[in-house]
Amino acid sequence: KIYRLTIFFNGKTLKIRSSNKRIVAIVQARMASTRLPGKVLKKILGKTLIEHLWISMNQSEMIDEIIIATSEREIDDQIYDLCFAKGFKIFRGSELDVLERYFQAASQENAEIIIRVCADSPLLDPSIIDEMINVLITDPIDYDYLSNTLNQTYPIGMNAEIMTFEALKDAHLNASKD
């Protein structure tokens, strides 16, 4: 069972959660979009899509850490520069092997539960994420993976996938490298 308590301290909200699982959101971000290159750094109301998503994800009561995962390509240096300037955690890995990038980022952060989201979803509702995490942790069925993308019931841009590290590791070990 998970118990949550929100405390206000000097105008800031401190979230306290009783859970023995390290929960890490990994945000997939790249500049080389085919339809709208550089869209994750496009600004809406003075903030980039990545910044809006970061703010939204920080409102989650369940997430311990948020990582922006981008490629090692030079074109993605702009994402790195923004994240560094804003103090966001960033991981750089393979551009083509996204599964490898996620696995390495999750491993580096000792993640036990991973939330996969895309940086071009700035309006993602953190309560949806918290609800999905809660199901994964507390449901009597022993889930390894949850998604709200397989049977699209939420509006586009509210998509998330949540998995255990064991499920990610298994996918990483058994995926075809073709």
Regions of interest found by a model, annotated:
Residues 20-70:
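N-terminal glycine-rich phosphate-binding loop and ensuing alpha1 helix
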Residues 75-82:
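Acidic helix N-cap motif at the loop->helix transition within catalytic regions
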Residues 84-96, 107:
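Conserved donor nucleotide-binding strand/loop of the catalytic core
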Residues 117-119:
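Active-site acidic Asp-centered loop
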Residues 127-149:
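Conserved donor-nucleotide/metal-binding helix-loop-beta segment in metal-dependent transferases, i.e.
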Residues 146-160:
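Short beta-strand-to-loop element that shapes/binds the nucleotide-sugar donor at the catalytic cleft/hinge
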